[in-house]
Amino acid sequence: MMLRGGCQRVGARLRGLRRGPRGPADGARRGVVSCIDPSMGLSEEQKEFQKVAFNFAAREMAPHMAEWDQKELFPVDTMRKAAQLGFGGVYVQTDVGGAGLSRLDTSIIFEALATGCTSTTAYMSIHNMCVWIIDRFGSEEQRHRLCPPLCTMEKFASYCLTEPGSGSDAASLMTSAVRQHDHYILNGSKAFISGGGEADIYVVMCRTGGPGPRGISCVVVEKGTPGLSFGKKEKKVGWNSQPTQAVIFEDCAVPVANRIGDEGQGFLIAMKGLNGGRINVASCSLGAAHASIVLARDYLKVRKQFGEPLANSQYLQFQLADMAARLVASRLMIRTAATALQEEREDAIVLCSMAKLFATDECFAICNQALQMHGGYGYLKDYAVQQYVRDSRVHQILEGSNEVMRMLISRSLLQE
């Protein structure tokens, strides 16, 4: 379907726990309505593309996520298959190859995909954010030149904001772009760039003017441009199916025609991109948490101690119930924020901040508790739950750390 535009291992059932879930839609196949069913409240059309995303995650991602993690493989071919379903430009306009879906639709899709591989889906969410920036703020020439190969994921994109000396204080970035005739000469470096070295298009925030946010502009730097180079591939706790490298500019000449928007508009563009990025990464946390609950539930049914299944322990039952409640609460917050962002409401920024803060904190805690329920087995890389823990941890840091989310929320309250 194309989108619119113990002590012993217990046979096959326990082997399934090692591989990870084939998709949280397993309850639906048995005719059982799960209390954590992510399709509740969705339209029939949304349920259809959600099903497509879950099936893709189960067939094309979950069987390979451990290998991608352990061998640090960037699954280019798999992502291009996902792009054939419209997942390369989910909320990009259809005239440049996007699916033209809403922010809520996007959250639904990324949650489903993240059950198959959270790390890969998170990269795809960043790629989507970059394509949206070009689609939303670029000229018609830029949109039609750059977006189509990005929507098919023939080309990949990276978002370049963070620098070695400017993380949460993004407006203090130092990468300079000095205009010389019809080019900008870039000097500086970006840190922790997802897709660094592999991506073809780098959406770069750089300083064309004075200090502060108004001196920042946005330019597209294409791979192969003289003066563009990359640092070493970082060794990370999680997110190993996507490379992370520094992006370095040394007298890198970029055509002025590659500037997105006006001079001085870059910080605004960066922040508008991040509002959606926060919803996207929080949705990836939902997928990891959902998959972890399914794994924990199934493990509790299989694993026996003191002569009976762990599922008979009321303490563990209550923990599982709390995990389910926190998952559903997170999902509701994310979907509320996604709708506000789509409608361009005044409260969208703070709702996105709240959703990102709450969901990434709670979903990481869910994944971590699911690991604890597995006991010693949860600490083995044979079992998928540990990968969901590692891959979801960084969501509390990136796209604006959760401390910054608290700053934005409190500022909004105090200004009332």
From Swiss-Prot:
Binding site for FAD: 159-168, 192-194, 303, 313-314, 372-376, 401-403
Family note: Belongs to the acyl-CoA dehydrogenase family.
GO biological process: lipid metabolic process; valine catabolic process
Feature: transit peptide: 1-23
Tagged with keyword Metal-binding: no
GO cellular component, one term: mitochondrion
Assembly and oligomerization: Homotetramer, formed by a dimer of dimers.
Keyword Ribonucleoprotein tagged: no
InterPro entries: Acyl-CoA_DH_CS (IPR006089), Acyl-CoA_Oxase/DH_mid-dom (IPR006091), Acyl-CoA_Oxase/DH_mid-dom_sf (IPR046373), AcylCo_DH-like_C (IPR036250), AcylCo_DH/oxidase_C (IPR009075), AcylCoA_DH/ox_N (IPR013786), AcylCoA_DH/ox_N_sf (IPR037069), AcylCoA_DH/oxidase_NM_dom_sf (IPR009100)
Pathway where it operates: Amino-acid degradation; L-valine degradation
Entry protein name: Isobutyryl-CoA dehydrogenase, mitochondrial
Native source organism of the sequence: Bos taurus
Record-listed substrate binding positions: 168, 275-278, 411
